[in-house]
Amino acid sequence: MAIHHLALAPCGFFTNAPPAAVQFAASHMHLIHLKRREVLGDGKQPFNGLGVVLQGNLQAVDLTLDGREAALLTATLHETFGHANLLAAQPVLLTWVAVSPSTSVAVMDSQAAQELMTFPEMALGAARLLAQDVCSFLGWQKIQAVHPVSARVCAWIQHASAADSSLR
């Protein structure tokens, strides 16, 4: 079932999009409601497409070598997720988990998302989001380089707050 184009209006990714692109996206997206800790998709294959958080929060998670979950990315209200894979030659598919009691997302499959990227404004928007992600990661790397102990401190903080973690 398609969503209404006005549901995408608050999303920054669609702010400067031409009406035809917004209509296309809305007509190819469907709404999914997730409970806390529920995985987006069928659970067998990681999500591969483009999505927008309409309510709640999602986290991309992976397992560490010792079997713990580690949050890689967080998508909050009105944020787009999955955009990096649309531009990558070798995408990294991520497992997205709802971290709010009630999370709603609008998603489209990879093929429709690739077609959406044929609109120049949408491809530029995805590139800008990706550039911001890279800058955020570089900033984090810079903090770790300047303060080598920070990686251990952050690991300790995560470990110490595990009982109160949003992933539990």
Regions found by a protein language model. Give the residues of each.
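Cyclic-nucleotide recognition modules
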Residues: A71-C135
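Polybasic "coupling" helices that flank or enter modular domains
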Residues: E121-R168
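Short, solvent-exposed loop/turn elements at beta->coil junctions and helix N-caps
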Residues: R37-D42, A145
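Cyclic nucleotide-binding regulatory module and flanking cytosolic helices
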Residues: M1-R36, T80-F81, N85-L87
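Short loop/turn motifs at secondary-structure junctions and domain boundaries
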Residues: Q23-F24, L40-K44
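Cytochrome P450 core scaffold surrounding the K-helix E-X-X-R motif
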Residues: V61-G67
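His/acidic/aromatic-lined binding-pocket segments of jelly-roll/cupin-type domains
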Residues: L31-I32, G41-D42, N48-L54, A71-L73, ...
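Glycine- and acidic-residue-biased ligand/ion/polar-headgroup-sensing regions
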Residues: R37, N48-V61, L77-H78
